């Protein structure tokens, strides 16, 4: 039997990593074999993304172009899908991914790139069974990110974060597999809401 593919999305500070871990633990308690993964990955492409994009590195006197950035993320995702996600699903595992296709669409669309083009270069990426958007006001996102001492270039750009959040909400209307969870609630309450979604949408409970 094919496994389930679940993605957690949201702006910085929305609790994706924490909730992905909690959901993985919950599935394991139910007897499932679980693969917890993330994007960018730990592959060579993921390393390039961290060095050239997330650290805002300069190449030949200028920042990497947004088009090149989008293609790097797509290349990393292609490797991830072919070598990690699909093989795990074929083995019947539950794959839980911290960020996926929707991150690329939301962030790079906010950078001014064409949504149609972004979807085209990511057309190889299989849609998950369930994509959970942890929605959070931008001011709370910035507060949480500052509190953990992890301010990146993305986090500093308040207007960008506003655009990204708006884009995520638009994507939730476009993609039938996306569901929104209020990330302002406590960690425990958010986890309970996610489990309720999984039971209803995937397991028919």
From Swiss-Prot:
Matches recorded under CDD domains: TMPK
Gene3D superfamilies in the record: P-loop containing nucleotide triphosphate hydrolases
Superkingdom in the source lineage: Archaea
Assigned keywords, A-Z: ATP-binding, Kinase, Nucleotide biosynthesis, Nucleotide-binding, Transferase
GO molecular function: ATP binding; dTMP kinase activity
Catalytic class of the enzyme: transferase
Gene Ontology BP annotations: dTDP biosynthetic process; dTTP biosynthetic process; dUDP biosynthetic process
Enzyme Commission code(s) on record: 2.7.4.9
Catalytic activity entry: dTMP + ATP = dTDP + ADP
UniProt KW Kinase keyword: yes
Pfam families associated with the record: Thymidylate_kin
Residues holding ATP: 10-17
Similarity section: Belongs to the thymidylate kinase family.
Name of the protein this chain belongs to: Probable thymidylate kinase
């Amino acid at each position: 039997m094919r496994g389930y593919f679940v993605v957690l999305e949201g702006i910085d500070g929305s609790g994706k990593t924490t909730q992905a871990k909690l959901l993985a633990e919950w599935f394991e308690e139910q007897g499932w074999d679980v693969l917890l993964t993330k994007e960018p990955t730990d592959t060579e492409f993921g390393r390039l993304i961290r060095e050239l994009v997330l650290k805002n590195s300069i190449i030949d006197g200028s920042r990497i172009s947004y088009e090149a950035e989008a293609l790097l993320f797509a290349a990393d995702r292609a490797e991830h899908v072919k070598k990690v996600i699909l093989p795990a699903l074929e083995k019947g595992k539950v794959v839980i991914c911290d960020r996926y296709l929707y991150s690329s669409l939301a962030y790079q669309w906010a950078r001014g790139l064409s949504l149609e083009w972004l979807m085209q270069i990511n057309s190889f990426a299989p849609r998950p069974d369930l994509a959970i958007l942890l929605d959070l006001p931008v001011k709370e996102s910035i507060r949480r990110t500052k509190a953990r001492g992890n301010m990146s270039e993305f986090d500093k750009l308040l207007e960008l974060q506003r655009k990204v959040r708006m884009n995520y909400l638009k994507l939730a209307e476009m993609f039938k597999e996306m569901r929104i969870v209020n990330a302002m609630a406590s960690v425990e309450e958010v986890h309970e809401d996610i489990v309720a979604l999984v039971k209803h949408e995937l397991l028919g409970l």
